[in-house]
């Protein structure tokens, strides 16, 4: 019989690990048709037209990354898109992940979720909890635009913060 995990210790964290992989579920994505950067050519992740991006929210600087699909998934529908930073991210720093111009195996564009489309296209959802998130999403879109990422190209975008040095080390010392 399994024992439920107590998340109390994780809830004390002020951000994510600086070396953690980034994951998203993107049904039907084809990395080759999308032009996703692989580990063999990570410098392409800095290209203006890179479809999968990790951007420093403060500076707009693109980060070196590569992408792959989860090879351990039990079905193609369950595969996660894994985005791997090529080096550890800066502590206490906010980053933005942007996925754009994604394609399926036939080369057809993937459509964003209805909620993300509503944020991206400035459509009112009429749902208060979603609308409360809109200012944060608008900030993400503005930062991406300054970094040269067109809003209308986006399939999905979100931000996260890397944990502080104190948070990472304090319980060890």
Regions found by a protein language model. Name each.
Residues 1-173:
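Acidic, low-complexity Ser/Thr/Gly/Pro-rich repeat segments typical of extracellular/periplasmic
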């Amino acid at each position: 019989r399994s024992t439920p995990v107590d998340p109390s210790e994780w809830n004390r964290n002020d951000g994510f690990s600086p070396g953690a992989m980034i994951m998203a579920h993107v049904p039907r994505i084809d990395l080759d048709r999308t032009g996703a950067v692989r580990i063999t050519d990570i410098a392409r992740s800095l290209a203006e037209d890179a479809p999968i991006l990790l951007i420093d929210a403060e500076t707009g600087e693109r980060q070196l990354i590569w992408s792959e699909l989860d090879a351990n998934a039990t079905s193609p529908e369950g595969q996660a898109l894994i985005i791997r930073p090529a080096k550890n991210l800066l502590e206490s720093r906010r980053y933005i992940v942007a996925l754009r111009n994604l394609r399926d195996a036939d080369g057809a564009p993937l459509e964003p979720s209805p909620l993300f489309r509503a944020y991206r296209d400035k459509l009112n959802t009429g749902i208060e909890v979603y609308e409360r998130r809109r200012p944060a999403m608008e900030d993400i879109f503005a930062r991406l635009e300054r970094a040269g990422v067109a809003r209308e190209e986006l399939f999905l975008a979100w931000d996260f913060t890397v944990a502080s040095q104190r948070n990472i080390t304090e319980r060890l010392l």
